[in-house]
Amino acid sequence: MFKRTQLIKRELFYWRKALFEYKKIWAYIYYKYIFSKKILDKNEILERPVNNSDLSVHILTCHFDFKMFFWSLASYYNAFKIYGQLYIHNDGTLSPKEINLIKKFFPSARIIDARTFANDFENKLNQYPVFKSIRARHFNFFSFKKIIHTFLAADNKMCLIFDTDILWFKNPIDIEEQIKLGCPRSLMQKNNTYKFLKDGAEIDQQLTQFNAGIILYARENFDTNILIDFFQQLNENNKKELHFADQTGHVKCLKNLSALPEDKYIIRGSVNENTIAKHYTAPRRPLFYLEGILVVMSSRAISEGSQ
């Protein structure tokens, strides 16, 4: 969880990007602080009924990213045709008002609170002492919540995880085909992975291409023994290793891992007719508001509410 000073510094960074790189500071202010709130004024439920009980869908959020989380999740329901049980992971900073908004728009969602996770899932955590201990030591790191909480919170056969800075624009055929087959292949977005472990040991070069913005796997392809070994190798004095533990950890422990097509699930470049989803990572976060939500709003399901 971020301290207030860190949040202010981060937002100032985005303002500078909007002003000097994108030359759209006033548009950024409008779309982020005024326009983006309109999604919360809808009277319609945004979720769709679960039609695949073998699938769990996970998204982690916090107070700072709350509006972004709403747009990301609404775009998921608009783009997908297969809907699993939704798990919304609260890092502990969501206000009661924000929790009520989640219940209003996503009434069947299961809300997982990081502050009570150790008690709520005590029996499961006790089965994995290494998970339990590293999670407790580094509770403030988002990465351990993402890889541990999502695995333990649900028992569904398949797990889809995506970040709040992902927007979905078209039906993800590649992902849904795997879901229909039971996920014999694990999928992650393609890009850069942090490459080094303790003492400079380098991860297999073949696996450095993955990004954790989008992850799909079958539980049977999640190797807990490999993940335990990975956690035990982490240099816990290196904040960068801790920050990327979910990304590198998934790369290490998922069997039959493949990358999603880079030209369809993009991180860089503008959205075009081939783009299925875009990951608006921190260096390009202002574009979430300057580009992404405008594309999403062109969809009837978002602009008028899910039917």
Question: Model regions: which residues?
Answer:
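Catalytic core and acceptor-binding pocket of nucleotide-sugar-dependent glycosyltransferases
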Residues: N191-T193, L207-L287
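A structural signal for short, well-ordered beta-strand segments and their strand-loop junctions
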Residues: Y87-H89, I111-D113, L160-D163, W168, ...
